[in-house]
Amino acid sequence: MADITKQDVIDFIANMTVLELSELITELEEKFGVSAAAPVAMMAGGMPAGGDAGAAEEKTEFDVVLLTSGDKKIQVIKEVRAITGLGLKEAKALVEEAPKPVKEGVPKDEAEKLKAQLEGAGAQVEIK
């Protein structure tokens, strides 16, 4: 058996179509009994009992929320697909149902980068 490096696997996956990649993910989920869905953090139950003590802490995770797609809806859909890895149908639905979060729980620098990327495509974006 030939030695296959991690880079070989990455290169192979990079050349797959979205449909092939989706099928691969499904097969891997079934084989290993896992889910590729990102966990959603519950904010309501995690509030500190100290009241103002929580307000003093600096927020470290941010949500990038798409407010509107503007005039360049197709460009925004392309950017949403690139950012989230969603399929065309899912990305289109997300853009059409705005305001919707595009990415949740990201560091501030990444949130700013994503906001600039989406605004460059013509969208109105908010960081929460």
From Swiss-Prot:
<protein>
    <recommendedName>
        <fullName>Large ribosomal subunit protein bL12</fullName>
    </recommendedName>
</protein>
<dbReference type="InterPro" id="IPR008932">
    <property type="entry name" value="Ribosomal_bL12_oligo"/>
</dbReference>
<dbReference type="Pfam" id="PF16320">
    <property type="entry name" value="Ribosomal_L12_N"/>
</dbReference>
<dbReference type="InterPro" id="IPR013823">
    <property type="entry name" value="Ribosomal_bL12_C"/>
</dbReference>
<keyword id="KW-0687">Ribonucleoprotein</keyword>
<keyword id="KW-0689">Ribosomal protein</keyword>
<comment type="subunit">
    <text>Homodimer. Part of the ribosomal stalk of the 50S ribosomal subunit. Forms a multimeric L10(L12)X complex, where L10 forms an elongated spine to which 2 to 4 L12 dimers bind in a sequential fashion. Binds GTP-bound translation factors.</text>
</comment>
<dbReference type="Pfam" id="PF00542">
    <property type="entry name" value="Ribosomal_L12"/>
</dbReference>
<dbReference type="GO" id="GO:0022625">
    <property type="term" value="C:cytosolic large ribosomal subunit"/>
</dbReference>
<comment type="function">
    <text>Forms part of the ribosomal stalk which helps the ribosome interact with GTP-bound translation factors. Is thus essential for accurate translation.</text>
</comment>
<dbReference type="GO" id="GO:0003729">
    <property type="term" value="F:mRNA binding"/>
</dbReference>
<dbReference type="GO" id="GO:0006412">
    <property type="term" value="P:translation"/>
</dbReference>
<dbReference type="GO" id="GO:0003735">
    <property type="term" value="F:structural constituent of ribosome"/>
</dbReference>
<dbReference type="InterPro" id="IPR000206">
    <property type="entry name" value="Ribosomal_bL12"/>
</dbReference>
<dbReference type="InterPro" id="IPR014719">
    <property type="entry name" value="Ribosomal_bL12_C/ClpS-like"/>
</dbReference>
<dbReference type="InterPro" id="IPR036235">
    <property type="entry name" value="Ribosomal_bL12_oligo_N_sf"/>
</dbReference>
<comment type="similarity">
    <text>Belongs to the bacterial ribosomal protein bL12 family.</text>
</comment>
